[in-house]
Amino acid sequence: MFEVQSELAVFVLLMLVWTVFVLYSASVFTWFVEVLVLAWRQTVPADDVAYGYDDIQVRIITIDAANIVQSTVNAVPDGLDDVRVIAEKPISVDGATVHAVPEEFTCTASHKGRALEWARREVPCDKEFVLYLDEDTLMANFEGLPEGDIVQITELPVYTGSWVTYLSEVFRIGYQREQRAFGRFSFPLYAWGGGIAIRTSLENRITWDSKTITEDTDFAWRAAADTGLDFNVLNCKFRNQAPPSVMTMLKQRRRWFSGTRQDSDLLPLHYQMFLQFRLVAWGFSPLIPLITLITFLVPGALPDLMVYRIGSLLEFATLFVVTGAGVASYWSESKLTLLAVPWTPILVVLNTAGALWGFVSPVEHFAVTTKVPLETVEKRNPAFEPGSLTKHDGRNDLPEHLDMNRFTSEHRESFHIHDN
């Protein structure tokens, strides 16, 4: 009896191992096709401008984080004068017109989507584009917009106090290089709302009035279903904040996974199947480093599967390739991201654990990711001097210049190491 149970346990384990292996192999293959083939020459350079500042209205979405929003407004380039703040509560922000969403306003959308929909209806706009920013997004290298119905702007998160989450973001940015290929798809697989420009006529036709917790992806999918969507990626490298803690990051990833999965019925059947396969691979990807480690450190844990071991080792190596892509994205702005490379296996597990959490226990309500005042970021981040963030002009780039003395002293303090 015990022998039968043992054989059954091995069979179940083998099925799990091979299922994860096949799913992740297919996911890795499609990522390489997207990044190396489909994304070739698809990114629009920051200086490829068809619409200038006079054609753009900026809208910054917040609940009531006046100090965070003030820094975002301060970074808007001079000459881009039509700046609006859409807030859930009345706040005061210099350099922008603040609009508070009335408490009595109701629509199908909720939370951030509700604010977006109210602004679409009530905030006057005679510009060709509305450029949406999250409350913590700092514009950079921005000269204007190219042609397109939706223009996705690239991002580079900054360190805000947690090296784990910052380096995890480096891995995410590497994986997100696939987004440069989305212009070749009928339906972009996802969108990032921290820096996204939408043609005003398209916004008014599609509206934000939809029940979702991932508003930007939901909007892009409904727009693509309504008409042939011209989706472009503009390589400006806007700076936003890495989550300040691991738990905040896990909750963020859980919401992204849950919202994308819940909205997938907006897609045609073949896109739904492709997306679901990607989501499952994403959700279970934390198992790849663990299974690979077990098969090599505990040879007797599984029957002798040489093909699997070689394949899993190659998959393991691709994780470092993704991290390398993230480092390459940051390279002109920061060399500090090289720290992510040796920590890749741990970063993969942490970065995707939130997706697994969302797979097991989906969330249905929007939650705001905690933000850190820029003055605090400048104190914590050894790559930024006081004023480099708070006085930044969004027309310029925002490189990081690492102060090694600050970097090493802060690490000594964090590990309670003191000079004699």
Q: Would you name each region that the model predicts?
A:
Residues 221-239:
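Catalytic donor-sugar/metal-binding loop of nucleotide-sugar-dependent glycosyltransferases
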